Amino acid sequence: MGRKLVRQFRYPMRWLSFLASGVPVILVFPAPSLSYLAWFALVPGMVLFTRAATTREAVARGWWFGAGYLIAMLYWMAPEIGPGLVLLGAVMGWMWSPFAVAVHKLLRPGAPWWRPLAAFIVVPSCWLIPEWIRSYQGLGGPWDLYGASQWQHPAVLALAAVGGVWLVSVALLMANVALAVLLGAIRPAWFRPAAGALAAPAIPEGKGAPAVSAAGRLARPAVALAAFAAAAGSGPLAFALTAPFPASRQIEVTLVQPGVVNNATQRTDASETLTAALSKDGTLAVAKPDLIVWGESSIPDDLTGTSAADQALLKQIETLSRADDAEILADQDTTPPGKGHEKWAVLVNPSGVQGIYVKTRLVPFGEYIPFRAQLSWLTSISKAASSNMVPGTGAHTLTVTSPSGATAPVDVGVLICFESAFPDMSRVETGQGAELIVYQSSTPTFQGTWGPDQHASLAAIRAAETGRPVVQAALTGDTVAFDARGRQLAWLGQDDRGQVTVPVDLPAQADKTFYDQAGDYVMWSGVGISVLAALVMLLRRRHFLANTTGAAGGRTAEYDADTGNPVRS
């Protein structure tokens, strides 16, 4: 079995073309943001999988496809992990093999009618497998989940309020399956293995296969078109049927983006200057902020420390908070006594530090190296973390209050940078009573790449999922704000410098989306369906295995479970 699978990786140029087939799919994400392609971008890959002569070849093709997709998706991480990116793609590409096998088994020409129908459920479920596996921090985190490509379309994102980003992925996959079924009905030759490939021959009508009537030939295109319409219309329908949560009140949030400043002290000075400008340029007369958010790693000192430098910086921020009558959420890298290196979000008002959140989900290779004992060599050829940071104990809210008491307290869910990729963290904070989700970010290593734009777009997904407005203040990268349905309120791009004050409508703490309450049921349903489909496939395969009589050495032949024809593997 192992040798047969390895043989599928022969002929390098041929398989490099399958590697390349996964690359164009990333155009659906920022910065290109060709989101409309997501509705059909997977069809070419599906054609390649159905043209595989055997299941093993489909496994290999899916592996190559996944490797190309993953490497292209994370190309901007090359400075962090160097050649480790290629290794990551090669090792993790297998996750797309179940998807390839499902397509190969269910969308081949001549398959019985029930297989294309099953494909509408099984294929999207198998696509969720790599998205589910990657959702674990140690395996890279759920970056560029397929549903996240729709971040610019609040009507489609309405599905996220029902089933998270996973349900948006399912709708997109169903649309791709529908187009593949339609194309297979119109041009079946495109889906057949290449001439000379060893595969089960199709049975001509009248010789073991039932005759297909004219009505039957029209059924598949009709079903495919109906399924595509249902998938494409599901988001707008959900958007129309679910009214937005009524605003319990409105607050003003100022997001500060100093831009690329390499010196740590100068970074703090830049944030302070932009914050001080609020009370000097008349901004407060127009829109007085209730909260001011600085970016990740915005200060070099420990605001809880006792040194003269620590206390001096704390006094400066307290003075700014008093002048603007708003609490300031800063961010620092710190090493508490007796602990390792941590990253803190620190809430400050004129009376001092009011709350701290410690970053829980750390960036693989950027803030720690998984399996450091085995992969420490990456530090000598890349910018991978020289030492592992220590994670916090979990997400929790901070309570923002007005120094003058002019506005009522606001419970805010505070998360840092990479944590915006994880749907569960913002959902946990919403469950704890968060009325607003705040992210602090800094992406200087990736400035000028697609990475910061992809990162910022995730705020729209988290807003739609939780029914909470989401803001992100970036030291470098993109500073953004979205309302509770994922509609864009503000965007400062990678080359921008300044501050923006955004009015955000806060829902009542008791208001929850269905996804807030039900959790990741779509993802777990997909995993269950995939496992069930795999069991069915294995049982049918076992039932139709037979020993070929008279074959030298007693070779075993595999028979197709539906046609009874031998399949050469």
Model segments located where?
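Membrane-embedded alpha-helical bundles of multi-pass enzymes
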Residues: 2-240, 448, 459, 474-479, ...
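Short, conserved active-site loops that position catalytic residues or coordinate cofactors/metal ions
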Residues: 29-44, 257-258, 288-304, 434, ...
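Residue-level signal for alpha-helix termini/capping positions
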Residues: 51, 107, 285-286, 322, ...
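Active-site catalytic loop in hydrolytic enzyme cores
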Residues: 77-81, 110, 135-163, 342-423, ...
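CN hydrolase (nitrilase-like) catalytic-core segments centered on the catalytic cysteine
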Residues: 81, 92, 124, 299, ...
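Soluble catalytic regions of membrane-associated enzymes that act on cell-envelope
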Residues: 235-365, 397-409, 414, 418, ...
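Short conserved micro-motifs at the rims of enzyme active sites and ligand-binding pockets
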Residues: 265-267, 368, 449-450, 515
